[in-house]
């Protein structure tokens, strides 16, 4: 009978989700939130009549109050920010809401297609993640931000170094709007990413430029630069190779003095990144 414990452990997530979990238990998203996504994905009406199951009298419940003289709704076309300083010749008008980094390989081809189709429909950008730029990112024509991690997937030599010629070919694509250098990530403090070899298909190996014989590991730091000043020159190099597209970097701030050293390098070299992405320590960008 003791062996049934292992069966129950296997079924535990499903039992909890279908029989125990309340509609508003958010771990990380509640059933109510997930249902809203499902219905909108199917273009179905997500409104429910006869009140709400939410306790609107609970502490810290936030709501919008009515006005007898409401403002005219803003034009969605104004919800954009121009990214690109004077050192960039192809600035990009970015939406204030976008799709942050998720790699092909970790996500399926259909998931990448769906995300990029959404970006195309909503006129916002889709960050590739460090797993390279795949054909599925390009299929529907949504704007792309190409994330470049320490593994240089999609633009690397056989020994894992940065290959400027391969980078230029991809970066010059009209659909690629910006380049993002990943320095660090909240979900992976102190080390690079890993894709187990069992998940590396022939297609993934070809897209990333890696072998299928072992796990695909991103180094903990970049080989193309070692110091903040070298990083600024690398940013300028990527700008030139991409024909003037915006180049920025992503980091999860650990020690404030390390970030200040990057700021000092900007002042010293007068090379200014076009944007900075701050990654949350809980893993959220």
Please annotate each region the language model reported.
Residues 1-97, 101-120, 124-125, 132-141, ...:
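Conserved, well-structured core domains of diverse proteins
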Residues 117, 133, 138-140, 159-285:
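Alpha/beta enzyme core
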Residues 146-154, 203-209:
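Glycine-/small-residue-rich beta-strand-loop submotif within the FAD-binding core of flavoenzymes
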């Amino acid at each position: 009978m003791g062996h049934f414990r292992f069966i129950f452990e296997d079924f535990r997530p499903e039992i909890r989700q279908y029989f125990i979990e309340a509609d508003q238990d958010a771990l990380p998203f509640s059933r109510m939130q997930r249902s809203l996504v499902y219905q909108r994905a199917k273009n179905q009406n997500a409104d429910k009549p006869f009140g709400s199951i939410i306790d609107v009298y609970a502490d810290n419940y936030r709501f919008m109050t009515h006005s007898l003289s409401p403002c005219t709704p803003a034009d969605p076309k104004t919800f954009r920010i121009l990214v690109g300083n004077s050192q960039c010749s192809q600035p990009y008008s970015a939406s204030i809401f976008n799709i942050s980094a998720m790699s092909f390989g970790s996500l399926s081809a259909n998931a990448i297609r769906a995300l990029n189709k959404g970006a195309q429909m909503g006129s916002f950008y889709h960050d590739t993640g460090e797993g390279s730029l795949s054909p599925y990112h390009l299929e529907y024509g949504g704007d792309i931000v190409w994330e470049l991690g320490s593994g240089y997937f999609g633009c690397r030599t056989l020994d894992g170094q940065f290959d400027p010629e391969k980078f230029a070919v991809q970066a010059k694509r009209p659909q690629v709007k910006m380049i993002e250098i990943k320095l660090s990530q909240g979900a992976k403090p102190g080390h690079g990413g890993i894709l187990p070899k069992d998940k590396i298909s022939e297609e993934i190996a070809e897209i990333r430029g890696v072998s299928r014989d072992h796990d695909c590991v991103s180094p903990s730091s970049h080989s193309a630069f070692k110091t903040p000043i070298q990083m600024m020159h690398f940013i300028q190099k990527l700008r030139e190779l991409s024909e003037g597209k915006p180049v920025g970097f992503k980091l999860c701030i650990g020690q404030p003095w390390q970030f200040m050293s990057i700021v000092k390098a900007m002042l010293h070299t007068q090379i200014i990144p076009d944007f900075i992405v701050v990654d949350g320590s809980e893993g959220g960008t």
